[in-house]
Amino acid sequence: MLGNGYSPDIKTVSVPIFENDTYRRGVEYQLTEAVQNEIKNRTPYRLARGSDADTRLTGRIVQIRKDVLGENNDDDPRQLQYSIMVRVTWENLRTGELLSQKEVPIAPEAVPLITQTGFAPEVGQSQATATQIVIDQLARQIVNMMEVPW
C-alpha cells in the first residue's frame, strides 16, 4: 500500500461505457466520463483500453427515478427527488479475481450504489443540474469503492 488507500499492484484500469437498462438515454455516457475523471484525478491508476489494462471497472444503470416530494395548490411539483441506481463490478483481468469485497443478494459480483438529490423547478433548478449532481456523487462513490479495505 502506498499510503493513499489504493493497491500498488494495480497500475491501469479499463472503464468501458456503462450499460443502461433505463429509458433515459445519454446518462451512461455522462456517468462513464465522470468515473473516468474521478479515477484520473483521485487515484494513482491510469486509464487503459480493454485487455491492455490490469483491471476492468464495469457498470450498469439499473434504475433512474424522479419522485415528487411536494406540490403547490395547483398540483404542480415544487420539490422533486432524482435518484440513480447502478451496479458496479471491478475485476482483475490478470487473475479473474473480483476486487470488490462487498456481497449483495442480487448478484455477488455486483455492488449496488444509489445516490439522490433534490431539486426545485420553481426556483430555477433543472433536471439537468440534478442529474449532474447525482452523477458526480455516484462517480465519487464508485472510486471510493476502489480503495483497499483497511
Predicted feature residues:
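Second-shell loop/turn segments in exported
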Residues: 19-25, 121-131
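Surface-exposed short loop/turn segments
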Residues: 42-45, 56-126, 136, 140
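A structural "domain/chain start" motif
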Residues: 1-37, 42-52, 114, 135, ...
